[in-house]
């Protein structure tokens, strides 16, 4: 198996390919990307057979922006017989994988694959049983063992491979399944909820998404992102010249500042979260976020960067590198992650965590 399959949003295959080619080159691993527009996935074929496994071990999945999932695969299995689809799939894995912890039978995230997804759900049970009989898969799921992926790109055609559970997306098809809350002011609320799922480990939610924390939402109107903060019992400074949702204001947890988000300066030093979803040039938003972090006005930030029409990966990489250098020059130790989330469209979501000593929020300062 000398290929890497990367799932992505349809229409962003070129960005995904540019990114994996860049990351592989940094590891001195070389190959070429196979891209089909609007397919929802990219293949990166390594020149050296063992390099594919090395890549999915050494490239931190959390550092990939445009990939929803990353796995090693073999050659495409074509024209699987309806009488026996299982044997060829088992054959691809024998001698390659044993005692895996989970099976995922998946498809690209395209409209054309919706019917195929129904088949995958039915096919999973007999395939899982067969893999357990062959000792390719453990009897019980184990989150510490590799994941087997069977990736159908068309009826009877699939890639078979694996990912490592400590360096992959834990979500089926790389997509968190979130339900839109009926009382939220806008669908944008799902972007921030997904960002919490992707960027913050569940075992740290009680500390980092705790009730009583203070937050600022720049460009808050009508309140889609503020809603997520209020739902977690935070106190929110909502900054926007436009109107906020009355239901959010009625909670008593929101203070509305009718100010331009680029001009707002917090009057207290107890802000933990800064969130921002403003339609502006990526460089301008990146600079604003860097200023907040350098000034120590927040501890963590989640913000969106709108993507240009061309050279999206290059533009994103440039802005993130610029932020990294600015923080470093100011002696700020920070973790930076970025992801093209499922609920993002022509934008990416960035998370920055400033590493400094913890402090207790003081309600009297609100």
Swiss-Prot record:
Protein name: Ribosomal RNA large subunit methyltransferase M
Entry-linked SUPFAM superfamilies: S-adenosyl-L-methionine-dependent methyltransferases
Assembly notes: Monomer.
Primary enzyme class: transferase
Similarity comment: Belongs to the class I-like SAM-binding methyltransferase superfamily. RNA methyltransferase RlmE family. RlmM subfamily.
UniProt KW Transferase keyword: yes
Gene: rlmM
EC numbers: 2.1.1.186
Superkingdom assignment: Bacteria
Catalyses which reaction(s): cytidine(2498) in 23S rRNA + S-adenosyl-L-methionine = 2'-O-methylcytidine(2498) in 23S rRNA + S-adenosyl-L-homocysteine + H(+)
Function as written in the Swiss-Prot or TrEMBL entry: Catalyzes the 2'-O-methylation at nucleotide C2498 in 23S rRNA.
NCBIfam families, alphabetized: PRK11760.1
């Amino acid at each position: 198996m000398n290929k890497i399959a990367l799932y992505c949003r349809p229409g962003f295959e070129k960005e995904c390919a540019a990114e994996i080619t860049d990351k592989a080159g940094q590891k001195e691993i070389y190959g070429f990307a196979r891209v089909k527009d609007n397919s929802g996935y990219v293949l990166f074929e390594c020149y050296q057979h063992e390099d594919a496994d090395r890549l999915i071990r050494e490239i931190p999945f959390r550092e990939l922006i445009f990939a929803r999932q990353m796995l090693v695969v073999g050659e495409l299995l074509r024209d699987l017989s309806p009488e026996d689809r299982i044997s060829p799939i088992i054959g691809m894995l024998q001698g390659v994988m044993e005692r895996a912890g989970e099976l995922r039978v998946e498809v690209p995230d395209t409209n054309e694959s919706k019917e195929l997804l129904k088949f995958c759900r039915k096919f999973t049970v007999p395939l899982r049983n067969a893999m357990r009989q062959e000792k390719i898969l453990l009897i019980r799921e184990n989150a510490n063992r590799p994941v087997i992926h069977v990736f159908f790109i068309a009826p009877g055609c699939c890639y078979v491979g694996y990912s490592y559970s400590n360096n992959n997306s834990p979500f089926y098809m790389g997509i968190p399944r979130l339900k839109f809350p009926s009382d939220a002011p806008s669908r944008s609320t799902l972007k921030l909820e997904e960002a919490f799922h992707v960027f913050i480990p569940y075992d740290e939610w009680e500390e980092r998404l705790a009730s009583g924390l203070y937050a600022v939402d720049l460009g808050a109107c009508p309140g889609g992102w503020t809603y997520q903060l209020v739902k977690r019992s935070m106190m929110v400074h909502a900054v926007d010249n436009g109107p906020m949702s009355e239901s959010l204001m009625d909670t008593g947890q929101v203070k509305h500042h009718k100010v331009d988000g680029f001009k707002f300066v917090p009057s207290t030093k107890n802000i933990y979260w800064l969130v921002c979803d403003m339609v502006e040039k990526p460089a301008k938003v990146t600079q604003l976020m860097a200023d907040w972090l350098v000034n120590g006005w927040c501890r963590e930030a989640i913000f969106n960067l709108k993507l240009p029409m061309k050279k999206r990966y290059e533009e994103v990489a440039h802005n993130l590198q610029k932020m990294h250098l600015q923080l470093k020059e100011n002696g700020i130790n920070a973790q930076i992650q970025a992801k093209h989330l499922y609920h993002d469209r022509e934008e990416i979501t960035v998370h920055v965590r400033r590493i400094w000593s913890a402090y207790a929020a003081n309600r009297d300062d609100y």
